[in-house]
Amino acid sequence: MDMGELPLRAVGTVGLTAAPSADVTSSGIITALTAGENLVFGEVCYIASTGKALKADADAIATSSAIVMALATIAADASGNFILHGIARNDAWAWTVGGLIYLSTTAGALTQTAPSGTDDVVQILGVATHADRMYFNPQLVQVERV
């Protein structure tokens, strides 16, 4: 259910749907950004110095600060929606439920195996709530392996 914009001018609660109803959907805090390259649903991005969203990569600290996930196919230099925090569903995922989800050494990708190479960056991006769903909650603290 899309509720559109909801101004928060009074004390109340904001609920997140724990089970998005369809493949490649989400529920949570969303923002619009400009893609710096072609993106697809589920690819995680950092914000470059240009202000554009680029695929995050755990191979180097300079490209590892994932903060958003693309919520659709977004062409380079086009505006699109990204989730900052919430629940995302992709039926192609096959997570181990309850396991942590990390930034991958493949640009834009997620993994349940923490990167282990020299200079790789370990960043927790969330936890698997179901085989096809994750709680997306990117951590700002990162560890660079030496």
Where are these regions (language model features)?
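Glycine-anchored, exposed beta-strand/edge motif detector
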Residues: 10-146
